[in-house]
Amino acid sequence: MIYRDFQGIQLSMLGFGTMRLPVLEDGQIDTALTQTMVDYAIDHGVNYFDTAWPYMQNHSETVVGACLKKYPRESFYLATKFPGHMVADRYDPADIFEQQLQKCQVEYFDFYLLHNIYENSIGVYDDPRWGIVDYFVEQKKRGRIRHLGFSSHADLPCLTDFLDRYGDKMEFCQL
């Protein structure tokens, strides 16, 4: 496996994304096959695992947590995302974050992303009622997030706008 240095940690160039996982005939995630895939990836040097709140009808984080539980926490890097891009009447970053920690069976996330910054979601991250960015900056200070970043499918003006506001708080971007 080829590794790249990111702020002093060695990340595998190949990451294991969990937006789509194998499913059984009844539509449920095939946890046994997923475990086999995770084991194979780790045995071959993959150490970066990426999940998110909405993946696999909100079950990806739970399955990923169960699959990684048997490995020492320091042997892998786990990334998940806050679903600010999803339409909601209210956004409670603390509630969602605590659920994510529980679902993933970890005490911290190595990488935490504000999910899918784009033209229709940037307002959610700006809205002072939710305090989303400030909440996650505080979690980083508390050591519950090691690296804070964002993912995006936005056009350049939207990305520029977001970075003008929050770029000093972000360490990475996943496009």
Regions found by a protein language model. Give the residues of each.
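N-terminal binding-site loop/beta-alpha segment at the start of enzyme catalytic domains
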Residues: M1-F76, Y135, K141
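Generic structural signal for short, solvent-exposed loop/turn connectors between secondary structure elements
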Residues: M1-Q10, P83-A94
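Structural preference for beta-strand elements that scaffold enzyme active sites
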Residues: Y3, L11-G15, N47-Y48, S75-K81, ...
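Short histidine/acidic/glycine/proline-rich micro-motifs that form metal-
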Residues: P22, W53-Y55, F82-V87, Y118-E119
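Glycine/proline-rich, positively charged
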Residues: E25, V87-L175
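Solvent-exposed, non-transmembrane amphipathic alpha-helical segments
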Residues: T31-T36, A66-K69, G84, R129, ...
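Contiguous hydrophobic segments
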Residues: M37, A79-F82, I117, S121-I122
